[in-house]
A protein has these predicted regions:
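Hydrophobic alpha-helical membrane-insertion segments
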Residues: 78-86, 147-162
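Juxtamembrane non-transmembrane "cap" segments at the membrane-aqueous interface
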Residues: 156-177
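Membrane-interface transmembrane-helix boundary segments in multi-pass integral membrane proteins
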Residues: 42, 168, 178-203
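Central hydrophobic cores of alpha-helical transmembrane segments in multi-pass inner-membrane proteins
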Residues: 47-63
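N-terminal membrane topogenic signal
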Residues: 3-20
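Transmembrane alpha-helical segments in integral membrane proteins
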Residues: 122-135, 197-216
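Short, hydrophobic transmembrane alpha-helix segments
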Residues: 30-42, 61-66
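Membrane-interface helix-boundary motifs at transmembrane edges
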Residues: 7-11, 62-73, 133-143, 216
Length: 216
């Protein structure tokens, strides 16, 4: 509990906004369930949880004294963060589920999925900001920029693996062999590389826009 409160107060204003927006998103789903008598789209709650994981990790990492913590711990946190950060941006692809909606429900679902995608994307950008702050204490600004673009492209690849290949972060534990084989195939595919780079550019420019707005 103390750990959660510490992270909450670390950036209280932002976390308050995230909390209120999360309540709004959950309320939207409950309203939809009441209207349609269906729990369809409730998978968005799980996707949102996965989007929060890298944000929590990067917030915790930012609170650490990197000079006085074991490198193994720091590298482990960074590895877990890299595995989960694509989940933050992945929710935007859930717009594909609008194909199953029509009439009034289509517009309601558009608002719901867009709301979850917005908070997920925002969490991803905030997490990238945390990473950039830490990164610039280790390497030059030039190399930090290159690294962030590479991570954005890796996020694009992660989205490809999740949306097209239909794997998720937990398959690393539950289905590692098939995952590794399909990752190797995808890594040598022009289609997946194009997909990854395009999503990477999209994420990176969104990050730059957010960065330039908040720096004013």
């Amino acid at each position: 509990m103390n750990f959660a409160l510490k992270l909450y107060h670390q950036d209280k204003k932002v976390n308050q906004t995230l909390f209120l927006y999360m309540i709004y998103c959950l309320t939207l789903l409950l309203v939809r369930a009441k209207i349609t008598q269906s729990v369809y789209l409730f998978f968005l709650i799980w996707n949102l949880f996965l989007a929060f994981v890298p944000y929590i990790i990067s917030s915790y990492f930012q609170s650490l004294d990197t000079k006085n913590n074991p490198k193994f711990k720091l590298y482990t946190l960074l590895t877990i963060w890299l595995l989960f950060i694509p989940n933050s941006f992945y929710i935007i692809t859930d717009l594909v589920h609008l194909d199953n909606s029509d009439g009034f429900i289509f517009w309601l679902d558009l608002i719901i999925i867009s709301s979850y995608a917005l908070i997920g994307f925002g969490l991803g950008l905030l997490s990238l900001s945390h990473f950039e702050t830490t990164l610039q204490t280790i390497i030059s600004k030039k190399y930090a920029t290159i690294t962030l673009f590479c991570i954005s492209s890796l996020c694009g690849f992660g989205i490809y693996v999740g949306r097209i290949l239909r794997y998720n972060s937990w398959d690393i534990i539950s289905n590692p062999f098939d995952l590794i084989v399909d990752l190797f195939i995808a890594a040598t595919s022009k289609t997946s590389l194009f997909f990854s780079i395009q999503f990477g550019i999209f994420i990176y420019f969104a990050f730059l826009i957010k960065k330039n707005i908040t720096s004013k």
